[in-house]
C-alpha cells in the first residue's frame, strides 16, 4: 500500500474572525505513506494524527514541507490534516472533514486552520463543526512573510484575560459583517469587515509588518490583517489590481517574501 495526500496552507482569523474563520491557500504540504518495514517517528505531528485513525506499525512516512513554519500560515494544521486523511484512507474510514476535525482538534487545540485545511475554501467553525461558506474570498490575499517566526503559544500568551466591552462589541459587529461579506462575495463589505480589536492589537508587537503594511497600503487596497497568530501579514486587494499591488508591495517590503495567493477550493485529499 502506498498513499499520497496533500494539504493546503491556511490563513485564519481574517480580521475579526478570531479562532473561527479561515481560508485554504494554494500552497501544499504532502505526505507519502508506504506499507513495509518502516519505523515511523511517533513524535511527528502528522504521524500522531495518522495514529488517531490507523496503526502506524510497519509504515514509513515521508513528509514534504513547503509551508513555512511558525509564520501564521497553518503549517501545523496542514501536517495534522495530512495525517488524518491518510489515516482515514488507510483504515477505510469516512474522511469527511467534520469527522476528521473532531479527531484533530485534540492535537491542534483550535479548529479554524484545521477546518479550512480539511474542507478547503472559506470556512467558519464553532464547537468543532464546520460551515463552508464559499469557494473563494471577495478579495485577493497578498502575504508579507518575514524571516522571523512566532510560535502560536507565544502569540496566545500575548493576549489578555479580558478586553474592554466596547472592543468586544466592535469586533462582534465586524465579525457579523464578515459573515455577510463572505456570503455575498462583496469586496466592499469585506473591506469594512476586516477590523479587529480582540487579538490584533495585542499581537502587533510580535508582528511589526502589520502596522507597516497598514501605513503603506497600495492604492485601492482593502486593508491588512494578521495571518493566524502572525507574524505574516495579509494585504487584501481587489482582483483587478492584484498584479500591480503585488509589485508595489514587493518594492516596498524587501525584508519580506511577498506572495500572492489564490484560495484553494480543495482541502486535504489524496493525489
Predicted regions and their residues:
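Glycine-rich, charge-dense phosphate/pyrophosphate-binding loop(s)
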Residues: 182-271
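DPxDG-like acidic metal-binding loop motif
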Residues: 73-97, 118-120
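Short beta-strand-to-loop capping motifs
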Residues: 35, 146, 235-239
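Acyltransferase
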Residues: 138-220
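ATP-binding N-lobe of GHMP and related small-molecule kinases
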Residues: 1-71, 89-98, 263-271
Amino acid at each position: 500500500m502506498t498513499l499520497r495526500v496533500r494539504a493546503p496552507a491556511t490563513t485564519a482569523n481574517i480580521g475579526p474572525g478570531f479562532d473561527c474563520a479561515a481560508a485554504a491557500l494554494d500552497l501544499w504540504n504532502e505526505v507519502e505513506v508506504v506499507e513495509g518495514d518502516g519505523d515511523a517517528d511517533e513524535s511527528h505531528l502528522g504521524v500522531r494524527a495518522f495514529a488517531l485513525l490507523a496503526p502506524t506499525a510497519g509504515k514509513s512516512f515521508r513528509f514534504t514541507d513547503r509551508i513555512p513554519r511558525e509564520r501564521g500560515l497553518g503549517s501545523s494544521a496542514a501536517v495534522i490534516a495530512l495525517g488524518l486523511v491518510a489515516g482515514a484512507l488507510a483504515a477505510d474510514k469516512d474522511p469527511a472533514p467534520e469527522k476528521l476535525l473532531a479527531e484533530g482538534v485534540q492535537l491542534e487545540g483550535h479548529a479554524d486552520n484545521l477546518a479550512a485545511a480539511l474542507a478547503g475554501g472559506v470556512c467558519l467553525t464553532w464547537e468543532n463543526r464546520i460551515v463552508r461558506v464559499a469557494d473563494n474570498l471577495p478579495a485577493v490575499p497578498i502575504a508579507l512573510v518575514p524571516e522571523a517566526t512566532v510560535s502560536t503559544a507565544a502569540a496566545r500568551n500575548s493576549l489578555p484575560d479580558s478586553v474592554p466591552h466596547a472592543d468586544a462589541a466592535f469586533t462582534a459587529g465586524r465579525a457579523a459583517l464578515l459573515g455577510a461579506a463572505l456570503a455575498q462575495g462583496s469586496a466592499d463589505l469585506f473591506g469594512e469587515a476586516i477590523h479587529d480589536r480582540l487579538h490584533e492589537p495585542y499581537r502587533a508587537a510580535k508582528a511589526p509588518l502589520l502596522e507597516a503594511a497598514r501605513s503603506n497600503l497600495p492604492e485601492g487596497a482593502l486593508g491588512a490583517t494578521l495571518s493566524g497568530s502572525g507574524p505574516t501579514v495579509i494585504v487584501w486587494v481587489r482582483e483587478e489590481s492584484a498584479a500591480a499591488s503585488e509589485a508595489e508591495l514587493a518594492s516596498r517590503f524587501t525584508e519580506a517574501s511577498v506572495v500572492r495567493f489564490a484560495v484553494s477550493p480543495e482541502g486535504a485529499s489524496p493525489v
